From Swiss-Prot:
Taxonomic superkingdom: Eukaryota
Gene Ontology terms: cellular component: chloride channel complex; GABA-A receptor complex; postsynaptic membrane
Description of how the protein assembles with itself and partners: Generally pentameric. There are five types of GABA(A) receptor chains: alpha, beta, gamma, delta, and rho.
Entry protein name: Gamma-aminobutyric acid receptor subunit beta-4
InterPro entries: GABAA/Glycine_rcpt, GABAAb_rcpt, Neur_chan_lig-bd, Neur_chan_lig-bd_sf, Neur_channel, Neuro-gated_channel_TM_sf, Neuro_actylchol_rec, Neurotrans-gated_channel_TM
Glycosites: N32, N104, N173, N195
Keywords, ordered alphabetically: Cell membrane, Chloride, Chloride channel, Disulfide bond, Glycoprotein, Ion channel, Ion transport, Ligand-gated ion channel, Membrane, Postsynaptic cell membrane, Receptor, Signal, Synapse, Transmembrane, Transmembrane helix, Transport
Summary of the function given for this chain in its UniProt record: GABA, the major inhibitory neurotransmitter in the vertebrate brain, mediates neuronal inhibition by binding to the GABA/benzodiazepine receptor and opening an integral chloride channel.
One Gene Ontology MF term: chloride channel activity
Family, as annotated: Belongs to the ligand-gated ion channel (TC 1.A.9) family. Gamma-aminobutyric acid receptor (TC 1.A.9.5) subfamily. GABRB4 sub-subfamily.
Organism: Gallus gallus (Chicken)
Amino acid sequence: MWTFQADRLSGIVSALAALCVACCAQSPSTGNISVVKEIVDKLLKGYDVRLRPDFGGNPVTVGMSIHISSIDQISEVNMDYTITMYFQQSWRDKRLAYNDLPLNLTLDNRVADQLWLPDTYFLNDKKSFLHGVTVKNRMIRLHPDGTVLYGLRITTTAACMMDLRRYPLDQQNCTLEIESYGYTVDDIVFFWQGNDSAVTGMEVLELPQFTIIEQRLVSREVVFTTGSYLRLSLSFRIKRNIGYFILQTYMPSILITILSWVSFWINYDASAARVALGVTTVLTMTTINTHLRETLPKIPYVKAIDVYLMGCFVFVFLALLEYAFVNYIFFGRGPRQQKKQSERISKANNERHRYEEKRVREQVDPYGNILLSTLDMNNELLATDMMSSVGDSRNSVMSFEGSGIQFRKPLASRDGFGHHPTLDRHVPLTHHAAARNRANCRLRRRSSKLKLKIPDLTDVSTIDKWSRIIFPITFGFFNLVYWLYYVN
């Protein structure tokens, strides 16, 4: 009986002892801390940080996982992007396995300096730093089977080579490449832990100028002269948001181009207004171009926005040249052409007048009479002048002779009493007709010169009328081709 009671009591004590050990393991008691201290001291005693796990045996497999906290900046000028992330690596080191405590041990970050760590680096890194507020943001956690979890909070600036030919209607592909610096595939093998779910946080990011379209995880082996290395790549594709550029670049350029067309409705003799408007629009487009170049790298090829701004600049500049052409036509070349034309007309009239005088002189008989039958009867001007110089029918007598038609004018008697037809003498009319003809020709030439020298300033220029139609249609066609090409 006493034996049975002793066995029962021993079982109860053992159960209570096991329960106490479990409670002590789960609670931060002084005994538990001492156990952990003993475990850590035991693990680090004789640990050689210079040797990788399973040195000389199979390669160490290191799993990678990343949580993206933010993408802070994407710079076209420097061709890079800045990303803040939680970078975690895990591997198994049998030298760090323990059985005394069935718990994971999260240790101080300074313990990481006493353990072997993978020589991981970012291949396209430009500048990186480990956050150190309030202490270094790194974590080391040990599992009973020897698995080590090493986490860091890193901000890195990585290179991202961009093709800006379609800027700002472009899409870019940026990568973050991870590789071992010294260990080849014979010593260490990287892999994405969790496959496609190894990278998280990308789907909730909101960037001011970009939209993340997709992300891909790639693993490949690369060969260098020092050996083969396994490289992990995080690739994400981003699309630029066009809204900012429409408000800041495209709309101002369109409005300035349309503003330059206002000069087509301004009278062409208002030189100050049209020149001031044209020069102002040209300088404004130049300012927009200059500001844009300062925000982009100096690349050798033409970007999409360069094509658009250059097209707008050409339209604005052509609007200014259009007025220069109109001004030259109406106030430069026009008067010179009119002067040349009036000189040609004057020269032709003088030659005609000399020719007519020569013909008249050749057709005068010895008595000074003009034989009208030999003159050109179709010359209305000369006939009119001759008839007006002779006078009315009461003081003139027309006689028809065999040799032609002659004008005869009666001579006044010496004593002032009337005149007799029989006393008429042949009076030459050559000098009177020629003088009157010359006077009339001079008056007509002067009036024609006045008409030629005074342009009709009340009509709007035909060039301006056509410009009002051609410029908007051409600019609309330019926009149609531009947006169809670059958007699609």
